[in-house]
């Protein structure tokens, strides 16, 4: 698959009568991890936080280009299948897609978002006169940690100015601008 399919993917597939196969693209663009429960069952997930809700403890990340096969007896078999795997995760996972309480490839999503706020604060300090900013307002939900960090470092008030409609899906993935505006 790695030689034929270019792009980002983390795949989990049930092979009826044999077991479960999981693999990640050679650059580890999309996250994939494995957890184990006290009784020895194995769970695969895109985010570590998913494991916690099912009494599984994080065991390890599936490496870029690695395949995991879990047979019917629960035995885990791992093999590196890519020629030159290199970790190059998608920044969008850390900025927007992942839950803040997840850890992906050893990086806390929450901490990554705080770091983004700190980086932005340094840039703002060097480019914007202090009296030109009145308040820091996040765009819900994922920008909250970054905005809070930015407000703290700039000594500005942090306010919730937008309310997310929880009954509407993610607008950036809707098929066209007209639908997104609607």
Predicted features and spans:
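PRPP-associated nucleotide enzymes
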Residues: 1-182
């Amino acid at each position: 698959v790695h030689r034929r399919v270019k792009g980002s993917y983390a795949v989990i597939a049930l092979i009826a009568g044999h077991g479960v196969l999981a693999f990640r693209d050679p650059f580890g663009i999309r996250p994939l991890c494995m957890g184990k429960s006290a009784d020895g069952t194995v769970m695969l997930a895109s985010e570590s936080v998913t494991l916690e809700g099912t009494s599984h403890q994080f065991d390890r990340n599936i490496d870029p280009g690695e395949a995991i096969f879990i047979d019917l007896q629960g035995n885990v078999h791992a093999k590196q299948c890519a020629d030159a795997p290199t970790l190059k995760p998608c920044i969008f996972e850390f900025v927007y897609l992942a839950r803040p309480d997840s850890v992906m490839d050893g990086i806390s999503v929450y901490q990554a978002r705080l770091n983004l706020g700190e980086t932005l604060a340094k840039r703002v300090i060097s480019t914007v006169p202090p009296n030109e900013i009145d308040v820091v307002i996040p765009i819900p939900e994922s920008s909250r940690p970054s905005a809070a960090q930015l407000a703290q470092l700039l000594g500005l008030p942090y306010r919730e100015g937008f309310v997310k409609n929880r009954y509407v899906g993610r607008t950036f993935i809707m098929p066209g601008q007209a639908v997104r505006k609607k």
